[in-house]
Structures are given as C-alpha cells and as structure tokens.
Amino acid sequence: MSIDDKVRAIVKEFKAYVPGKSKEEIARNYGIDPEKIIKLGSNENPWGCSPKIAEKLMDEVSKLHQYPQPINPELMDEISKFTKMPVENIIVGGDGADEVIDNIMRILIDEGDEVIIPIPTFTQYAISAKIHGANIKWAKFDEENEFKLDIESVLNNITEKTKAIFLCTPNNPTGNVIPTEDIKKIVESTDALVMIDHAYIEYSNEDYDLTDWALKYDNVLVLRTFSKVFGLAGQRVGYGVTSKKIVDYMMRIKPIFSLTRASQASAITALQDKEFFEKCLNEGIESREEIYNGLKKFKQLEVYPTEANYMLVKVKNGMNSSEFCEVLLKKGVIVRDCYSFEGLEPYYFRVSIGTFDENERFLKIMSEVVE
C-alpha cells in the first residue's frame, strides 16, 4: 500500500494555496534587480513595521532557548486597550488569523455539518472547513452588482445543519464592506457562529467596525490581525474576539506555544507605537486613493471601490488575468492574479497599496501596458 492509499480523500481534492509572488522569486525568474521590483501583490504594509521593534527583538535573543508564555498578559492587555474589549473575550493565534479559523473549525465541525461561505473570498475558510468534515454551502458576492453581498444567497442556505458562516468585511479580494444591516440580519437569523473577518477593518470607516458585536451576540466571532496595517505579516500574529465560552473551548485545543517570543514582543511594541500606526494608516489610505484614481483613468480596466488596502481590477483589453500579470512581472511589477479565487472569472487581479514612489512607478508602467 502506497502513501497515496493512506492519505484522506478530502486532502486529495485540495489544490495547494497560491500565495502572492515574492521579490526574490521574480528576481530569479526574470533577471530583475530586486531593488527595482514593485511588490503590490500581498496586501502588506509597504512602510513595514514599527522601527522600535528591532530593539525589542534584540532583547529576546538571549531568551530564545526558553519557551514563550502561552498567554502573554502584556500582549493581552495591549490588545484589550486597542480594541476596547475585555481580555477574557480575546484569543490570540500564532499563524495570523488562520490559526483562529482552524481552531474554531476544530471545536465546531463534525462530519456532515454545513458552513456557509460567500465567494469570491479568502480561500482559507473553505480549506479549514472541508478538512474538518464540513460541507460547504456557497453564497455569493454578486459580480453584477459591484460584488455586493447577495444576502438572500446566505439566508437561503441556512439550515439546522449550519454550524458557521464566514463574512469577510472588507472582503478579500473585492475590497468592499458588507452593510451592517445585512450582517445584523444574518446574525439574528441563526444560532450558527457568524465569523466576521476584520483583517482590513483599520482601513475602513470606523462605523463598519463590528468588533463590539462579540459582546452583544453569543454567536459572533470577530477576526483581527497584525499582518496588515501593523506591518507584521512575517511574524504571524492574529486574534479573535468572541464570547467567553467560545474562548474557553478554543483554549482547550489551541496549540500551546504557537506565538514565539519574537512575535509576542513585536505585537506588543506595534500596539504601543501609536504614532507609527497612525502614520501607516493615514498614508495607506492616501496611497489607496492615489492608485485607485490613477487606475480609473485607463479605459481598458474596471476598478472596484474599496475600503481595504488593496483593490480589485478587471482586465478589459482582451487578455486574461494570467496573461496580463505576466506582462507586469516582466516589467518588475507584482500584483495578485485572482484566477485561484473561487467565484471569479479569469480576468481579475488585485493591487495592494505601495509607497508613493512605488505608486508613481507602477502607474507609469501601467500606462505602457493599457490605454
């Protein structure tokens, strides 16, 4: 019997996750100087993380032989102050928000349970739900209506078998937010757990922030992350805000030491450096508007409104998204080809914010590629 005969059938159905391309990969493949490559494909903070983090990391070097604290009181206190949520309603994960997603599936899903996912959206939801035995019921963000959530496609899929519903807002990759009244209607129409993914909420109008709903409703879990505006994608720190009962159940099965000493120190310092946070947020929104307005001038592109640090763009010059993105790669520009997102036609790509210098160079290159 080979290993293929022993691997679970559901695993064989999966395709490997397609991440955004790195500067190093493009430099190798196309012979381009890495310093000249413009990386706008992974929804990162182009200004990086707080400069104060480097010093804090050096303080941890002498302690790397010691296990980290499973629960770091200082980190929990800083997250509590930032979100204005009680510490006992917070759970922190060491693989970004992905760990929180996976742990909630582990405590909720039995074989045959149902999970509702509107698409196109973040692909990790379906991977985690399926691997734990869930049947996926697909809802939709309506392409014909600027990718607004088709709320009826969610409500009509709710059954007694529904254990969880994922709502990404702002949605990745479309960038739009789900109206608060629609989320309220969904939450109040079911006792299934509604996971509101707020990975990009800092870039949105504060009225769209529903983190406090974790205290108002027993069936809400809000996902947050340090990977975006805080510039810590490489440290993999995310967290959830939810009811005390759900936190308790998740702590029973959560990996004990998933947050490293380095990731804890980085997250604490990022939260404390409020000046750098505000700078990155304000300049990030300005960068977003600069790219959006610049791309809107090209007749061969359709650019969708966004409340995140990226925007979805449709190619209308006869190329599909992979062909178009290949042209950009050869010119040293990395954007995200969205062909791998379930529910999208092969004509879309996603552009993240850049520094203002990167934006200027990117838009100049775009003028050479499209009309």
UniProtKB/Swiss-Prot annotation:
This is Histidinol-phosphate aminotransferase. Its cofactor is pyridoxal 5'-phosphate. Pfam families: Aminotran_1_2. It comes from the Archaea. HAMAP family: HisC_aminotrans_2. Transmembrane segments: none annotated. The keyword Iron-sulfur does not apply. NCBIfam families: hisC. One of its GO terms (molecular function) is histidinol-phosphate transaminase activity. Keywords: Amino-acid biosynthesis, Aminotransferase, Histidine biosynthesis, Pyridoxal phosphate, Transferase. Signal peptide: none annotated. Pathway: Amino-acid biosynthesis; L-histidine biosynthesis; L-histidine from 5-phospho-alpha-D-ribose 1-diphosphate: step 7/9. The modification N6-(pyridoxal phosphate)lysine is found at residue 228. It catalyses: L-histidinol phosphate + 2-oxoglutarate = 3-(imidazol-4-yl)-2-oxopropyl phosphate + L-glutamate. It is an enzyme of class 2 (transferase). Its EC number is 2.6.1.9. Belongs to the class-II pyridoxal-phosphate-dependent aminotransferase family. Histidinol-phosphate aminotransferase subfamily. GO terms for biological process: L-histidine biosynthetic process. CDD domains: AAT_like (cd00609).
